C-alpha cells in the first residue's frame, strides 16, 4: 500500500517506528522524511532527492489510503510513501511550488544552496572598486565554485560549459548601472535533471546585497 506525506506539513498518515528496547511508537512521517533528506544531503549533496531511499526502523504505515486516492494526492503534489519488500520509501520529492520548473525539492534545495553561497561571497566584494578587474575576479571565483559543484553532480551537462555560466559583462552591468554603484552577477545553472537553465542573480547596491531567481 502507498501512504502520504503532505509537503505542506499536514499529515494524512503516520509511521509506526521501531524503538530499540521499547514499544513501537506512532509518529508523523515528516521527521523521518526530513532525516532521510538530511542524510542524503550530508553524504551526496543538497541537490539529491530523498525519493526511493529506505526509512530506518519503520515497521508500518497507518491508516491505509485507498488506491483510488493515489492519483489525486500526486496531482496535489503530496508525496507518497510505499511499503515494499525492501522497506518503506518516499516515491516522490515534490514541493508545493506552482512553477513546475521549481517543483522538485532537490531543485529548490540546490537554489537555496546557490543563494547562500552567492550572498556569502558577495559580502567580500562590497568595498571593492566596481570595475573590470573586480568583475573578472568575481567570474573566476564563481567559475571555480560551480565547477566543483558540477564535478560533484549538482548540474546537468557533459562539461562545465554546458552546465553553467557566470555572467558579469556589460549585458548585466551596463554603464549606467555601474555609475550608480550597482554590481550584478548572474549564475545560470542547469540542475541535474531535464529542465531549462535557471538564473540566480546577485545584486549589490552600495552595502546592500540581494539574490533573485529567474527562469
Predicted regions and their residues:
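Structured, hydrophobic secondary-structure cores that serve as assembly/anchoring elements
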Residues: 1-215
